Amino acid sequence: MPKVRQRRRKVKACKMCEMNVEYVDYKDIRILKDFLNEKGKILPRRLTGNCAKHQRMVKIAIKRARQMALLPYIKY
């Protein structure tokens, strides 16, 4: 029986922790767009490399920006 190789994921460092960001502002659209895919969905932590604390902040900021019509809910 052949051996199955397991892939090891690279652990990405949190960009927000490196920049010492304490608060993610919903009005800063340029930063928030980095955490959306091409259809406008929020990217998961394993793709962005965010820590849990900053991923929650990004999620809340994106949802607030969507409610304020600064970001679209979906892109066609």
UniProtKB/Swiss-Prot annotation:
InterPro entries named in the record: Ribosomal_bS18, Ribosomal_bS18_CS, Ribosomal_bS18_sf
Residue stretches spanning the membrane: none
Gene3D superfamilies per record: Ribosomal protein S18 (4.10.640.10)
GO MF, any single term: small ribosomal subunit rRNA binding
Cellular component terms per the entry's GO annotation: cytosolic small ribosomal subunit
Record-linked Pfam families: Ribosomal_S18
Entry keywords, A to Z: Ribonucleoprotein, Ribosomal protein, RNA-binding, rRNA-binding
KW RNA-binding (keyword) present: yes
Biological process terms in GO annotation: translation
Job of this protein: Binds as a heterodimer with protein bS6 to the central domain of the 16S rRNA, where it helps stabilize the platform of the 30S subunit.
PANTHER family, per database record: 30S RIBOSOMAL PROTEIN S18, SMALL RIBOSOMAL SUBUNIT PROTEIN BS18M
NCBIfam families assigned to the protein according to its UniProt record, in alphabetical order: S18
Family: Belongs to the bacterial ribosomal protein bS18 family.
Subunit structure: Part of the 30S ribosomal subunit. Forms a tight heterodimer with protein bS6.
Name recorded for this polypeptide: Small ribosomal subunit protein bS18
